[in-house]
Amino acid sequence: MLGDLASWVQDVIERLGAVGVALLVILENVFPPIPSEIVLPFAGFVAQRGDGSVVVMIFAATIGAVVGALILYGIAAVIGPERLRAFVVRFGRWFGVKPTDLQRAEEWFDRHAVAAVLLGRCVPLIRSVVSVPAGFRRMRLAPFLLYTAIGSTAWNTALIGAGAVLGNQWERVEPYVAILQWVVVALIAVLVVRFAVVRIRRRA
């Protein structure tokens, strides 16, 4: 399945160039199974080969990232914090989440919104998800777009640049991104366990 997806991604970039990169990055933001660790390094390889330029590929990928992030932001903003709070009040107990937990999360995001968006765009698995709390909290659109663009440019430059440097060995980028993803998963797991332990102790 992943092999077929990778082949399709490469075919889109071969056919459409930078436009294909932008479209794929939009999809990657709203449909996570499309992996940026394939899209971006391969785009760098294509540019290094002479079918485009690295700068144009980075620009196209950043445009795609901003558009994709804006889609998720818009969906979350339409749902809004009121519906989210109502959902937590009604169903939160099934997930071990209380309205006060949501309130603390909202307050944390409000304090750290800039860092969350800027740095989150450089972290695998978090890159797309960070647009959702920004939308729920209805973060001001101009700063959201600005910091999304800056963070996305850094990520895109790193992966496209690596693909351009490695040339026909661009696939060597993927294992390193996979390691970073597992680190993120491990950190999330630790936070979830810590949250659960704290809740259990409070109930005891």
Locations of the language-model features?
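Transmembrane alpha-helix interface/packing and boundary motifs in multi-pass membrane proteins
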Residues: 22-40, 120
